[in-house]
Amino acid sequence: MNTKKEVYLEILRIIAICLVIFNHTGLNGYWLFTQRTPGTLSFYIYLFLSLFCKFAVPLFMAISGAVLLGRKDEPVKKNAQRIFRIVIVLVVYSFIYYLQSIYLGECTFSWKDYVVNLIAGNISAHLWYLYLYLAFLISLPILRRLAQNLDDKLFAYMIILAVVFN
């Protein structure tokens, strides 16, 4: 992929952002179907929208894959920098949420407790996406090699497996 922005990826990114926003609207959006009478058209429309917005995370991951997997011969240092940035964000924000838990009396301070919960992803549930993205970045060199050497038959086989087992 060249450095020029791909318009279709930007459109998909906008769609994914809108889906994430809808997913976080609570009773004013995502859970609106629960305020409708089951079996009515409005119930099914809002239910469909709520289910459809769950497509946002796989869409973001697909966009990341399209952008990052296609880059040939990218230096390992570049990927290490990406990983480092995500780890820093994860450590800093997790520490802030850990301090909040201490302030609220939910736990007492312990470096060991902080590190164990940071590694386990138990400090703040809404940071889960950073763990997912971090796993993607760590796997990126392997995934890139697989993607670059995948022929059409193996790609079709992989898609069939994904559809059947998901």
Please give the residue ranges for each predicted region.
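C-terminal TM-helix exit segments that contain a strictly Trp-centered aromatic cap at the helix terminus
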Residues: N23-L27, I96-G105, F165
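Transmembrane helix-loop junctions in multipass membrane proteins, especially transporters and channels
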Residues: L32, R36, P75, I102-S110, ...
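Aromatic-enriched alpha-helical transmembrane segments of multi-pass intramembrane proteins
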Residues: I119-G121, R145-N166
